[in-house]
Amino acid sequence: MTGKGQGFGFGLGKMKELAEAFKKAQQVQEGAKRLQEELEQMEILGEAGGGLVKVIVSGNQEPKRVEISPDALAQGADLLSDLVTAAMKDAYIKSTATMRERMEDLTSGLELPGF
């Protein structure tokens, strides 16, 4: 049995900790929603061939558009395919780095396990 006043170890101090944890969770949830909206609106540019091919994606890697210069078209199908692939990879890398950076900003200082 527990001594007087010890109860189940869930006193006022623990209630404050629990309330603070819920508050932090709500802040993260609100921040994540705002972040998702920001990421959807972003336009991140990936390029290849010195700008001959440009791929624009959102901050959450959704393709928005592809721009191909006439000079790239003149290079032939195989090279054009390589340029488009390289530009897509460039855009993807930049977009995921941006997403990761924004997530770190969102969770910094919250003392969340695993972040």
UniProtKB/Swiss-Prot annotation:
Signal peptide: none
Keywords tagged on the record: Cytoplasm, DNA-binding
Sample GO molecular function, one term: DNA binding
InterPro entries: YbaB-like_sf, YbaB/EbfC
One Pfam family this sequence matches: YbaB_DNA_bd
The UniProt record lists the keyword Transmembrane: no
GO CC aspect terms: bacterial nucleoid; cytosol
Location of this chain's protein in the cell: Cytoplasm, Nucleoid
HAMAP family, per the entry: DNA_YbaB_EbfC
Functional note: Binds to DNA and alters its conformation. May be involved in regulation of gene expression, nucleoid organization and DNA protection.
Subunit field text: Homodimer.
Family membership noted in the UniProt record: Belongs to the YbaB/EbfC family.
The protein's name: Nucleoid-associated protein Ava_2322
Lineage, highest ranks first: Bacteria, Bacillati, Cyanobacteriota, Cyanophyceae, Nostocales
